[in-house]
């Protein structure tokens, strides 16, 4: 295996060099390093630094370490006691070399199955960052974690409805391919975490979640409390979507009655869920993370988290371009629509999900009227 030494953040790491003509993920190397996920890791460093700033004794597990870059950065740049587990012998050897390369005394490399590691040990912070679905590791992670659970899912198609049956199997929820599909995916992932934690009498508070490139990422604070776990489940629910007029409605609860006909146009409605209908972000936490990102000079992370922090705290969003297309109109600047909605007495904001997405508490019929007026 050919390797080279790179620097990410302030951490040096020896990483494998795949063949130039290899596929992605590269089959030519047994240890996987993905440079495209640096934004994910930058945000993780800032978020975990913010979360643990008054608790330097917290322990951190990178459950699916691969090259070890995530755990190495947490140990080196945040200073937490870090464990990194991987089943591959070459991964563990490379992680141990990188621990020495960075002169880290607070790191351990473990050659074991991630689920076994989490069954045998508890950690304050657990990070699941698989290539693919986190579903096979969610049960043991929720059992083992004490304070903060961080989860990445790169299987976006099952989460957002493109591969519906896979979504049902993996996450115990019916996904739906809608105009707001990235948020659908994040909320199904969040809902799966909430239900799995509740089975272990634990509650969660979402601190930060986002969709970026080809993955979804969530950070949730964990609390062992039966009453809080019950209250957490009250924020689960379902979405009723009409594909005829575009109307979507949310209904809280795990056993709900969804009208089969759209109350706006009489068209057939389709149900998605159960999924998380509560907040996706904690604004105070986002402020702390932004401060860390600015201090550490993570400009891409600053831009993304600023959008997350400033999003309207309601479920689901609209795609302005698709809305205009359905009305046979050309789209004007999204910010113009957001400002106009505010002038008409509604709450509205841009979102991080796309450059043309927005959230508002205005009814869809009012949004359509305003869009038509802006184009007249």
Where are these regions (language model features)?
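SAM-dependent transferase fold signal centered on methyltransferase-like domains
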Residues: 1-376
């Amino acid at each position: 295996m050919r390797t080279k030494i790179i620097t990410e953040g302030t951490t040096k790491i020896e990483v494998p060099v795949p063949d130039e003509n290899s596929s992605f993920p590269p089959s030519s190397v047994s240890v996987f390093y993905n440079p495209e996920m640096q934004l994910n890791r930058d945000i993780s460093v800032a978020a975990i630094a913010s979360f643990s700033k008054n608790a330097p004794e917290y322990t951190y597990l990178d459950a699916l370490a691969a090259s070890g870059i995530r755990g190495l950065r947490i140990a080196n740049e945040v200073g937490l006691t870090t464990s990194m587990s991987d089943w591959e012998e070459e991964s563990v050897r490379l992680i141990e070399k990188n621990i020495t390369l960075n002169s880290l005394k607070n790191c351990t490399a473990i050659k074991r199955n991630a689920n076994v590691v989490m069954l045998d040990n508890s950690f304050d912070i657990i990070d699941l960052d698989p290539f693919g679905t986190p579903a096979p590791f969610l049960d043991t992670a929720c059992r083992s974690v004490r304070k903060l659970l961080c989860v990445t899912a790169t299987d976006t198609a099952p989460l957002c409805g493109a591969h519906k049956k896979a979504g049902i199997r993996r996450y115990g929820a019916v996904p739906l391919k809608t105009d707001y599909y990235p948020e659908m995916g994040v909320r199904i992932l969040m809902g799966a975490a909430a239900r799995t934690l509740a089975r272990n009498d634990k509650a969660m508070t979402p601190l930060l979640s986002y969709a970026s490139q080809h993955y979804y990422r969530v950070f949730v604070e964990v609390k062992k409390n039966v009453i809080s776990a019950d209250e957490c489940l009250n924020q689960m629910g379902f979405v009723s979507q009409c594909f005829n007029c575009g109307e979507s409605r949310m209904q809280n609860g795990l056993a709900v009655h969804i009208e089969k006909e759209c109350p706006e146009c009489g068209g057939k409605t389709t149900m998605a869920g159960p999924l998380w209908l509560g907040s996706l972000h904690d604004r105070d936490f986002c402020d702390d993370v932004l401060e860390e990102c600015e201090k550490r000079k993570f400009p891409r992370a600053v831009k993304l988290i600023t959008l997350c922090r400033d999003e309207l705290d309601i479920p689901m969003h609209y795609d302005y371009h698709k809305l205009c297309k359905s009305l046979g109109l050309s789209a004007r600047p999204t910010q113009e629509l957001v400002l106009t909605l505010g002038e008409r007495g509604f709450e509205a904001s841009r979102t991080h999900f796309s450059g043309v997405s927005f959230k508002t508490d205005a009814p869809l019929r009012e949004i359509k009227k305003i869009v038509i007026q802006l184009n007249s």
